[in-house]
Amino acid sequence: MSPNGSDRSPRRPMRRKLLQALTAGLVLATATGCTYEDFPRLGMPTPTTEEAPRILSLWQGSWAAALATGVLVWGLILWSVFFHRRSRTKVEVPPQTRYNLPIEALYTMVPLVIVSVLFYFTARDESDLMSLNKKPDLTVNVVGFQWSWCFNHIEDVPGSTGDAKTSKELAGIPDRFIEDFPANAGGVYDCGTPGTENPQTGNPGPTLWLPKGKTVRFVLTSRDVIHSFWVVPFLMKQDVIPGHTNAFEVTPNKEGTFLGKCAELCGVDHSRMLFNVKVVSPERYEQHLQDLAKKGQTGYVPAGIAQTSHEKNRETNNL
């Protein structure tokens, strides 16, 4: 026991525990199978669209702010626990500090600044990501149903007849989207069967083909319940709501086949509501549309539940 009455426990066990914790963290980091190139993405897949890096940057910034705040809070907690765990005097209750205005102001302003900065960058990026071009390179009507997907390619494909602007199958889509459809777009479609595999890829669900370097507008409609259209490497997903039409645009910039899934619990086979996105060259994409037309998959499948009167009143004419 020291002369001042303090009876501190040795620090060696604490150092041993700290070493064990660091070793466990190192093992956990290496056991994930991630390379050093994966760690900066903080669990996100490699972006495959021109818009995805912006989402990744927002994700990384949010984690950086959270970790900085956590380190500060954890540091203060650990400092208090280790260095003030026992009084060095015989006084059982140390002097209490109350009504410290500078500290209270700091506790109020720091969280307010953090939240305000995160709100600004989130609002800025969301506004840009959700903006729509007047004339996208191509439009795909994504139709969700229990428990698979249909894709209406709204294109003027040789061998197809009709017009997307007057098609009764697409009548449920709001006029503000129909007005941007190409003229005389007879279109082709592709549909999946719940729980089956795509014969071309061996992966579950249908395959949506997209051209590299072209801006694609997804117009999302549902036939039954709420779904969510999520292409994982696009870092973008949007709800598919019956009676309401959502839309967003992306520009794929990497060829390959990528996983897509429904991200909204939609019933007993929700986990099997998968699909694939195959990004190819524009020439291969055009050939694929012609192949669908040769198979007889011309025209469009029903888009789903029409926009309700309430939603039509809420809609504006501005994209």
From Swiss-Prot:
State how the cofactor is bound: Binds a copper A center.
List positions binding Cu cation. Answer: 227, 262, 266, 270
InterPro entries, per database record: CcO_II, CcO_II-like_C, Copper_CuA, Cupredoxin, Cyt_c_oxidase_su2, Cyt_c_oxidase_su2_TM_sf
A single GO molecular-function term is: cytochrome-c oxidase activity
Give the required cofactors. Answer: Cu cation; heme
The record gives the membrane topology as: Multi-pass membrane protein
Kindly give the PROSITE patterns that the UniProt entry links to this protein: COX2, COX2_CUA
Which keywords appear in this protein's UniProt record, sorted alphabetically? Cell membrane, Copper, Electron transport, Membrane, Metal-binding, Respiratory chain, Signal, Translocase, Transmembrane, Transmembrane helix, Transport
**What are its E.C. numbers?**
7.1.1.9
Q: Which CDD domains match?
A: CuRO_HCO_II_like_5
Leader sequence range is: 1-33
Q: Name one GO biological process term.
A: ATP synthesis coupled electron transport
Catalytic activity annotated for this protein?
4 Fe(II)-[cytochrome c] + O2 + 8 H(+)(in) = 4 Fe(III)-[cytochrome c] + 2 H2O + 4 H(+)(out)
Its EC top class is translocase
User: Which Pfam families did the record assign?
Assistant: COX2
Its GO CC terms? plasma membrane
**What stretches pass through the bilayer?**
63-83, 101-121
Subcellular location per UniProt equals:
Cell membrane
Family according to the record: Belongs to the cytochrome c oxidase subunit 2 family.
Q: Which NCBIfam families match?
A: CoxB
Sum up the protein's function in the record's words: Subunits I and II form the functional core of the enzyme complex. Electrons originating in cytochrome c are transferred via heme a and Cu(A) to the binuclear center formed by heme a3 and Cu(B).
What this protein is called in its record is Probable cytochrome c oxidase subunit 2
Gene of origin?
Answer: ctaC
